[in-house]
Regions:
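TOPRIM fold recognition
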Residues: 144-288
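Residues at alpha-helix termini
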Residues: 43-47, 140, 199
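Basic, glycine-enriched DNA-binding surface that flanks or lies within the catalytic cores of DNA
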Residues: 8-105
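Phosphate-handling DNA/RNA-contact segment within nucleic-acid enzymes
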Residues: 65-170
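Generic alpha-helical structural element
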Residues: 26-32, 127, 182, 243
C-alpha cells in the first residue's frame, strides 16, 4: 500500500530510530504503586479508578543510561501478541515529555490493554488510538458502554500495517474501531486501517482539506469532516470490518475531550464583514 502524505509524531519517531534493537537491560522497570499514583495521570484528567483498572498494562521505567534524568517515567509496554517478551515502551513524562524506549519495535508491536483477563478469543472490540493517554481517556469516558470483552490499543504516534494485522490476529473475533485524532493524519490512519482490514489496495493523497482516493480503479474524493465509512460505501462494496468511535468534533483527541480542551475555532468572516475590513484597510492606505 503506497505511503500517503501524513505526519507522524516526530517525538516518538526520533526516539525509535535512535537504536536498532530494544535492550530491556537498559531500563529499570517497576509496577505502579496504587497507593501513590503519579500525579501525571490526574494532570491529564485520568482518574485513580482508571489507572487502577489499567495498571496491569502500565509500568514505571527508568533509563539507566540517561545521565540528565535519574527518575522514573510512565512506560506503556509494547508487545506483538506472538510472545510475552516486551518489545519496547511508549514513554510519557512531566512537562509534556513523550518518547519511546530506544529500539522500540513500532513496526509490528503496540501497547495493548486486554481487559478480557487473557481470553483473547472472547474480545469483540479493539479500540485503536494514537497514544496510550488517548486510549485511557477513551476508556474512562466510555467505560459504562464497553464491558470486559474489549482491548485498548495505542500505536504511539506511528502507523504500520504490521501493527494492525498483529493486533487483529491476536484478537481474531474482534472488530477494530478507529478512535484516532480529529485531524488529517487521524483520518488517513482510519482510512488506511479500513483499507487494510477490507483487503482493498488504496492510494491516498491530500487535496486541500479533503482526501483523494483511488481504489479498485475508481478515483473519488472524501470529505474529512464526514464519516469515512458512509462515504467509502458509496463507491466500494465494504464488509464493515472496521467501526469508528471518534472524539467529538470540537476536540482533537480523546484526552483533550476528557480535559475539556476544545480545538481553537478559526473565525471565517462573512462576506459583508470581509468587505468592511477591506474598505477600512484601503482607507488606512490612502491616509498613508
Amino acid at each position: 500500500m503506497p505511503e500517503p502524505e501524513y505526519r507522524e509524531d516526530s517525538d516518538y519517531v526520533k526516539s525509535v530510530k535512535a537504536d536498532a534493537m530494544f535492550d530491556s537491560s537498559r531500563y529499570e522497570v517497576k509496577p505502579i504503586n496504587l497507593e501513590r499514583i503519579p500525579a501525571m495521570f490526574s494532570q491529564r484528567g485520568l482518574s485513580n479508578e482508571t489507572v487502577k483498572d489499567l495498571a496491569p498494562f502500565i509500568s514505571l521505567i527508568r533509563d539507566k543510561r540517561n545521565e540528565k534524568f535519574d527518575g522514573y517515567n510512565i512506560g506503556f509496554p509494547y508487545t506483538n501478541g506472538k510472545e510475552e517478551t516486551i518489545k519496547g515502551y511508549e514513554i510519557r513524562g512531566h512537562g509534556g515529555y513523550k518518547s519511546k524506549a530506544a529500539g522500540t519495535d513500532s513496526t509490528s508491536s503496540a501497547w495493548a490493554a486486554d481487559l478480557s483477563n487473557g481470553n483473547e478469543g472472547l474480545v469483540k472490540s479493539v479500540f485503536f488510538c494514537e497514544s496510550a493517554f488517548d486510549a485511557m481517556a477513551f476508556y474512562q469516558m466510555n467505560k459504562t458502554q464497553l464491558g470486559k470483552d474489549v482491548a485498548l490499543v495505542s500505536l504511539g504516534g506511528t502507523f504500520s500495517d504490521k501493527q494492525i494485522i498483529g493486533v487483529m490476529n491476536r484478537f481474531p473475533h474482534a472488530r477494530a474501531y478507529d478512535c484516532f485524532d480529529n485531524d488529517l493524519a487521524g483520518r488517513i490512519y482510519g482510512l488506511r486501517m479500513m483499507a487494510l482490514l477490507e483487503g482493498v489496495p488504496m492510494k491516498i493523497n491530500k487535496k486541500g482539506d479533503s482526501l483523494q482516493v483511488e481504489a479498485k480503479g475508481k478515483p473519488f474524493e472524501l470529505n474529512t469532516e464526514r464519516s469515512l465509512l458512509a462515504q467509502v460505501s458509496k463507491h466500494l462494496s465494504i464488509r464493515y470490518k472496521m467501526g469508528q468511535w471518534l472524539p467529538p468534533k470540537a476536540f482533537k483527541d480523546w484526552n483533550d475531550c476528557l480535559m475539556n480542551k476544545p480545538m481553537e475555532v478559526i473565525h471565517t468572516p462573512h462576506k459583508d464583514e470581509r468587505n468592511q475590513n477591506l474598505t477600512e484597510r484601503r482607507k488606512s492606505g490612502l491616509k498613508m
